[in-house]
Amino acid sequence: MSDSVTPGAYGVVERGAASTDAARIAEHIRIAGYAVVPGAVSSADVADLGLRLDRVMARQVEEFGGAERLASIGDALTARCPLVYDEAFVALAAHATVLAICRELLGDYVVLMQQNGVINPSGQRHTQVAYHRDLPYQHFVSSRPLAISALFCIDPFSSETGATRMIPGSHRTEQFPSESVAAELDTAVSAAPGSFIVFDSMVFHRAGENRSGRPRRAVNHVFSVPIIAQQISLPDALNGRYADDPALARLFGYDVTPARSVTAWRERRLARQDR
């Protein structure tokens, strides 16, 4: 049998075929673990989302009784579920390009497991500067992704502002690498405002040190297959909002919340048949 020759390679008999931008980005993520999607949101909308995130954070500080109480549980720099507070973050979570990439990697049934605003202040240590997976404490790998993270950049991600740092390919290894190997592989991912950094949630990553003199803000989304429970129940937090929108109801997990009773489970199944 003769060797098959393809452009830029030889001895290759199988090759990936990425016919769309989403498929190409998904292939990159399968191999490297991450990819940058630039220019996903306009500059005007990015600025608006930054103001809205600041307001959500201020409201959550007030709701919980002050910044000191939040700091006592290590949560003073995280605005949780901003989509519950502001519809602009609903649109961000349902970004068509990001969902297309997620469906390439996870299949058609994609659920938003969590959405968190992340604030990396200048000159302060954020909990996210430690290496972690977005599915923490898990030391196994799967043949296909279980969850995909999409980190939306409100401010520039650079060496000065503390760009997210990845260990490429670590979504395919069970253990965290040795200290020396982690340092060798550690890669800063720069991105402009309005970009998404999309990555396999099992990639080990961390926030960089912000030395810019101003906060570096982002909104992280974790999309998953429906067998993984949400961090915070979005159907409960939303109090039924968007339940009548089939696409958003599925995305926000309305169809996969545990049934409250046997009868409720059967009624839900019957309702699905009637759709």
Question: Which sequence ranges carry the predicted segments?
Answer:
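Catalytic core of non-heme Fe(II) oxygenases with the double-stranded beta-helix
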Residues: 126-190, 228-238
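A structural signal for short, well-ordered beta-strand segments
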Residues: 115-117, 150-152, 219-223
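Short, solvent-exposed loop/turn segments at secondary-structure junctions
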Residues: 42-43, 118-120, 157-159, 171-172, ...
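Aromatic-acidic/polar surface patches that form glycan- and anion
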Residues: 42, 90-94, 143, 183, ...
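Conserved double-stranded beta-helix
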Residues: 2, 173-198, 202-203, 208-275
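Non-heme Fe(II)-dependent double-stranded beta-helix
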Residues: 2-32, 38-131, 136-138
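A short, structural micro-pattern
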Residues: 111, 144-146, 213-215
